[in-house]
C-alpha cells in the first residue's frame, strides 16, 4: 500500500505524473484513464497492491489549504469523471485504487491528529 497522488512514493526510480488538477484542465477522459493505467502499471511492477489515490478532494474552497493540486476540480462532474477514469486505469493495471480525501480535508489543521471541524450546514450543502 502506497500513497500515490502523483505516482508511487517511497522507493527509487519512480515516475512523477501530472497532478490531478493539471490532468483535469485537459477535459480528456482518455488522459485520465491513461494516467491511472501508467500509475497502476508502475505500482504493479514494484509489487504494490493498493494505491492511495486518486484524490477526490479538496474541493478548492480553502486556497491556503495547500492540497488543492492533488484533487481534480471544484466541479463535481469533472471530479467524478476524473475519479472514475483514473480508478479504472489503476485497477485495469491490476492494482486496487483507493480514492481519498473527501469532504473537509482542505480545512484541516494539525493534520497529524484526528477530526476536522466543519460547519454542519456547509457539510450538508457539499
Write out the residue ranges for each language-model feature.
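Glycoside hydrolase catalytic-domain context in secreted enzymes
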Residues: 1-126
Amino acid at each position: 500500500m502506497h500513497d500515490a497522488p502523483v505516482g508511487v512514493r517511497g522507493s527509487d526510480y519512480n515516475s512523477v505524473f501530472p497532478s490531478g488538477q493539471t490532468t483535469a484542465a485537459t477535459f480528456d477522459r482518455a488522459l485520465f484513464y491513461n494516467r491511472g493505467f501508467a500509475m497502476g502499471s508502475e505500482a504493479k511492477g514494484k509489487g504494490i497492491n493498493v494505491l492511495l489515490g486518486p484524490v477526490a478532494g479538496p474541493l478548492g474552497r480553502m486556497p491556503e489549504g495547500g492540497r488543492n493540486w492533488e484533487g481534480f476540480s471544484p466541479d463535481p462532474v469533472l471530479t467524478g469523471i476524473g475519479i472514475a477514469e483514473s480508478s479504472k486505469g489503476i485497477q485495469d493495471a491490476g492494482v486496487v485504487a483507493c480514492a481519498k480525501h473527501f469532504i473537509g480535508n482542505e480545512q484541516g489543521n494539525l493534520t497529524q491528529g484526528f477530526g476536522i471541524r466543519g460547519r454542519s450546514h456547509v457539510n450538508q450543502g457539499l
